[in-house]
């Protein structure tokens, strides 16, 4: 069985090694020398003088000893500071609504030279076809695109209808792929803790690689048991003390700042010189509008330094070297001899002002990357068949019967959080006793034509209209919220016509919609085009009274039955805390 040293980026051929050594000794000219540059020392702090010598895709040497060394090409960095390329330790590319190729075209120029992706969104929809397409894209990328093999497809068996299953027998052949680093987030933490044998079989099969975790709010004996099984990290940490306990027990923290789940400000005080090797940065779910307006990993580094006063060498350490060490990627994460020449040149450390990005020793031309994206995307042969097999719906299909003076369970939405507590509301005949309650419905889209699951949502801010989407974790059925079933049906039927996507309806009309024809998750449009439509969608949501930063991303997590506490799947209202379905209406004897 191959180990991590045979993975992408981790080996150098003998001929390349001999050439690298000759350049290091000064016997042959470097392919490229970056002059007039300073290196941020991630190990000791401070900066070191250049130059940086590059041979092939590797760093041959650094420092004043190489002043005046011959090179085939020289670049004057103008006094810039060089830092290692950034690593996003956990994300779902599908959540950007871009293809892997379009994603690379906008994040690589922002210094993100390496990503570790879990493709469980597309695998839930179309199984291995989606995974093999992602791997094809990774093989042709300049960005180091690593894939974790999705561990929970479906997210939690028996709680939802999804488009595919991905059992261990199907997972095993992918372990040896050079772009696969391990097992993706093990969301079935109850199964791990209970010693469920099929779940433990998955951990055992990938134990020689990395075992990613998913353990929101897990503590005490349960957390100890989860870690004892071999799980190594978590990106779902929500509270400071929760993070402190996980670090103390040896768990690595992936500190997340996505478009909806924003945990960096809460967890940043944990980061210190001592524990920073156990802390990484990730985005999890971030859309192209946020990437265009705020940035990607660069935005997280900027916030750590400027808002939380983290020392620059520590901030850049958690953005690169920490993740490289965690995943066993020995040739990534530092600017040092023998490392892969993934380098970001900065005009300003605190502002993360990027001058130039190098991937494997090659300067990245952002415009050329964008221009070539469409052709490269076509060559990757993305799956094109329609995955939305649902007959149109009527207002009657989406009408939840309500009884006067009866109590109902509502899902409570919390801005910028994925947890959704249960809230009791009472129907008074002409409205609820609690303000800001709307209807929610989830319906499977894989051809079974099941009756929609109906429920109530509190604290969305929606005052009129309806929102619908086929981005709905993790099974990606159709989710819709609104006040009037007729408008909800209009939004859903628009998505059926589009083959999937996002839609806003107001005043009885479709205001704006974004078709997502690739698995109902992604568009073949450019990042800029998607960002413009997302901008229009966000404005339409604001016009409907919503103040959430990312209404569609928050809505996408209302169906995920592995994050507490109350969710609505295509099979009904699910109590995550007690692992069971429950009724929307609360019986009188228990009210």
Swiss-Prot record:
GO terms for molecular function: adenine deaminase activity. Its EC number is 3.5.4.2. The keyword Hydrolase applies. One of its GO terms (biological process) is adenine catabolic process. CDD domains: AdeC. Keywords: Hydrolase, Manganese. It catalyses: adenine + H2O + H(+) = hypoxanthine + NH4(+). The keyword Transmembrane helix does not apply. InterPro entries: Adenine_deam (IPR006679), Adenine_deam_C (IPR026912), Amidohydro-rel (IPR006680), Metal-dep_hydrolase_composite (IPR011059), Metal_Hydrolase (IPR032466). It is an enzyme of class 3 (hydrolase). Its cofactor is Mn(2+). Belongs to the metallo-dependent hydrolases superfamily. Adenine deaminase family. PANTHER family: ADENINE DEAMINASE, N-ACETYLGLUCOSAMINE-6-PHOSPHATE DEACETYLASE. Homodimer. This is Adenine deaminase. It comes from Edwardsiella ictaluri (strain 93-146).
